[in-house]
Structure formats: structure tokens, C-alpha cells
Amino acid sequence: MKGQETRGFQSEVKQLLHLMIHSLYSNKEIFLRELISNASDAADKLRFRALSNPDLYEGDSELRVRVSFDKDKRTLTIADNGVGMNRDEVIDHLGTIAKSGTKSFLESMGSDQAKDSQLIGQFGVGFYSAFIVADKVTVRTRAAGDKPENGVFWESAGEGEYTVADITKNDRGTEITLHLREGEDEFLDDWRVRSIISKYSDHIALPVEIEKREEKDGETVISWEKINKAQALWTRNKSEIKDDEYNEFYKHIAHDFTDPLTWSHNRVEGKQEYTSLLYIPSQAPWDLWNRDHKHGLKLYVQRVFIMDDAEQFMPNYLRFVRGLIDSNDLPLNVSREILQDSTVTRNLRSALTKRVLQMLEKLAKDDAEKYQTFWKQFGLVLKEGPAEDHANQEAIAKLLRFASTHTDSSAQTVSLEDYVSRMKEGQEKIYYITADSYAAAKNSPHLELLRKKGIEVLLLSDRIDEWMMNYLTEFDGKAFQSVAKADESIEKLADEVDENAKEAEKALEPFVERVKTLLGDRVKEVRLTHRLTDTPAIVTTDADEMSTQMAKLFAAAGQSVPEVKYIFELNPDHVLVKRTADTEDEAQFKEWVELLLDQALFAERGTLEDPNQFIRRMNQLLVS
């Protein structure tokens, strides 16, 4: 062989091979599904390229994949006449993993084999799965349109290096030969191989054929028998398709090893004609938050594959949705640029977005447990929706889930409809608080009066929550109100103040003025409040002022943060406030006021500019 060289696998491939062989062995038959799935993709790509260059078919447009085995040599071969690969493509596809962040992710994986096997599936391991059952894999391939002498040979035992060389290959496409390990003889059994193909590959449009050998007149006659239905699943009638087939098709297009949570298969006729098959995965991909993460739907036009990851059909906050769309209204030569500016695309995107939101609403209604699985995996992504998609804001809001004071649990299980159904008589607003953690939200002094009145408060502690609530202004005609902001509706909830209390408050007016004079412009205002029961003081912000959590978001993003001017609210019934008001010594008075302000700021922000000064002051006052 000419041009032979031995090369080392990229380190991530070595790690993946090791993990895969050990984690996926209990489900080893999936290697055949993966290799046939790759062959199907190769056929799709050839069909697409041949639209503009029919010569790529080289006189053979009947695309298929053929499976054969040799019991004497203990080999199993999967051969397709798809698009094939040149030498550079072989090295790129079979020697490296092109996903950024792969190395650190693989290093973080532990010894939980069940979990590992699910996560490994997300790499679209395809080809490498051959090493689960083979101790050596040989590949012979030639790219469509290349000369026969530009064929490529690739071989590896999957241990750290591979050999690549130039060969002559008359027919285009890829032929993968697995040299089976000892003990894997089941994959040399005709019936066993047929049953695996039927189980996993009925849904793909590419014919899968198995070799038949018959003795006729003393000679061995070879023929090929089609095993699968070879009809694209989404073109079939829904009533004819079993759940298992939908599940297997999902695994084929998503390169996932787990079943989806739910799906929606629809054929639309009329102004626009298209078929969509949309899936909600049961597990988030490991790189969901990676900027390079590819997402979007497979796009077909009149059943011809056009592209993977067509992100123009789904808003970013639904980037976890997998599936395909087959349109009759787009041109076969459509490009990503054309899709970007197409009215057809915009209309399809709008319809598919509504379809997904309806699918999620149905899942939430029919199976709360499954919806909780969805929420744990993708809730943070869905929370981007209110800012991104004003037109569907109400539908998105129905799908949101929160922790709340009603459940006494950090689990985000409360819907806005649940909250509204429990609102007290006369309650006009939906109350919420944002904080760095569930514990900080739950124990915030801002909740004291509302707890006393039995009014539910939503406890928001994800980083995105404050940003989301800037866009989510109302639900079911009821405004959202942060309990950390000054608001008349909260003060109104306080019990009617009796005449004696009013007199006592009037007597405290000089104290309030004294505090204002001391603090100056460090606070926006000083006032007495009846929204506290156990806490001496809190700080709040005006409705139009930037909140504490929003300021933290700005700071985390490296942006300049305007100074937040707080309202300092004092509880006139608290013993510490009364003691401070009775303190005549100015130095001692200053220490008490500073302590109360620091306590309030610490409860609100979780940090202080000078924590050592706070500790010193507190210790000093404790012993005074």
C-alpha cells in the first residue's frame, strides 16, 4: 500500500474508547445500529451533493447499505455506497473528536457505568462503537467523484494508534470490517444479525440488505435481501408507527442512547405543506451551555436531506429540541443564508415553536413526574424564553416552575397557575424574591410579614431569575412584585396600626431624622416599616432602582455597576431599634446604626465591603 503511515489517536479518542468499551458492553448490539445510522447519513449527504452534481452517483443512484459476515475469518462487514471519504476526512473523522470541551468533560466522568453509558451516547460515538465487539477494525473508503486510486485504507486495534494508507477502490462509499473479539460469535449468526437490523433500522429510508449465500449446481450464488422497511419514518401514517419505532428513530437522529420524554409527529397541509417530528430529550447534552454547541433540526425538502442543525426553525430557548422538518415549500438548493431571510422559514419557526410549547404543556398536564424530569434538565434554558419571545410569553410562563414558601422544599414544582389558585382574598400581586441560594431566599427578612399573613412567595435562586423577571411582568392579569422592593401593597398587608402605636411612631420621628443625618447620602431614605416581625431592619430598593441581584449579574458579566441606593427600613417594635433610639451618646449611637445597616446589607447582598469592621463593631457592642 502506498502512502502508509501510523498516527496516534487524539487523547480524547483514547479516553472515549476506553470508557465506551467498558460502559456500553451490556448493550453491545448498538454498534450495528450506530454503523448503519452512519451509512444512512452518508447516503443523505450524497443525495444532497448530487442535486447540484449528478455525476457523483457514478452511474449508481440506488443507495443502500449491505451487511455480510465471514464465519471462517470471524469478520462482520458493513458497506455503503454513500458519499465516502478522502484521506484528510478519514483522519479528521476517525482520529479526532471535533467537539470543544470534550477533554475536560471526559476527565470529569466517574465510575458510574449506567450514567457514563448515557453520557457517552451524546458524543455520537457511531464509528467507535465497533470496538465494543471488535479487537481490530478495518476501513476501506473512497469519496464520491474521486478517482479509484484515491481510495483510503484505515485500520486500528483501538488502543492508541491507527494506520492509514492509499489504496485503489473501484466503487465509492465506505466499507467497515470488524474483526470480532473472542466470545462475540453471536454477530456471525444470520438470524441474530437480522433481528438487530429489524429492531434498530426499520425507521431509516436507506435499504439495509444482508448477504444470502445459496448453493446452485455446485456453485455458491450470492444475493442480497432487504431486511428493513426502508421508508422514512416521518412519511408513514402515525397510526402505523409503534412507540418503539419513534424511540429508535430519535436515537438515530439525536445520537442519544436514552428514550425521549415525548414527541410530536404532524403533517400540515394548506398554505404551507410540511411534516415535522419533534422530540424532547430526557437528558441535557453535556455541552448544552457551550457556545459552540450545535442545535437545530434536521432539514429535508421533499424528503431530500438538506442539512443538520438547522437552527433557524427553533428559537434559542428551545435549543434542546431534536427532530426534523420536511418542507414542500423550500427550494432544494436552499442554503443557511436563504433560510435566514425566508418568509417560509419565519412561518415554520412560528408554527414549530407553538407546537413545542403545546407539547410541553400537554406533558406537564398528563405526566407531572416526566415534566419534572424535563424541568430539571432544561428549566434554566426555558427561562430564557420570556425575554426572547414576547409573542409566546404567556404560554412560556405557564411552563415555568418555582420553589415557594408553600412547599417548604427547594424543588421547583410550583406553577404560576398553582400560585394564582392559592392567592388570598384581596391579594392583587404575585410575590417573589430573588437570591443567591434557596436558603437565602427562604430565610430572607423580606418574607416575614407575608409569612405571618399566610401569603405565598415564590423563591427564585437561579442566576437567570432576576434577568427573567425583568421581562416577565404579569401572569393572568396579575403583576409580579419583588418583596425586596418598596411597595405599597406589602405595607397595606400590615395590621391596622392602633392609636398608641401611631403615637409611638410619632415619638420616633426625631430618631429617624437622626439616622438620616448620620448616614447622609449613603442611603436613599430612612423610614419605619411594619413589614418586619423578627428582624430589626432591612434595605429595599425603589421600583425603578436596579435590584441587588441584577447588580450582581452585571458585576459577574464584567460590566460597570451603578451604585444601588437603598431605602433603610427600621422595625419600630424591635428591641434593638428601641435601644438604638434611646442611646444618647453620639459615638455609641453611630455604632448601633452602623451595625443595623450592616446587618440589613449583609442579609440583602450576602457580602459586606468591610466584614472585619462589622465583626469588630458587633463584638464591641456585645460586651458594652
From Swiss-Prot:
GO CC list: cytoplasm
Tagged with keyword Chaperone: yes
Pfam family, one: HSP90
Superkingdom classification of source: Bacteria
Compartments where found: Cytoplasm
InterPro entries: HATPase_C_sf (IPR036890), Heat_shock_protein_90_CS (IPR019805), HSP90_C (IPR037196), Hsp90_fam (IPR001404), Hsp90_N (IPR020575), Ribosomal_Su5_D2-typ_SF (IPR020568)
Region of interest (C), ranges: 553-624
Recorded family membership: Belongs to the heat shock protein 90 family.
UniProt cross-references to HAMAP family, sorted A to Z: HSP90 (MF_00505)
Name of this chain's protein: Chaperone protein HtpG
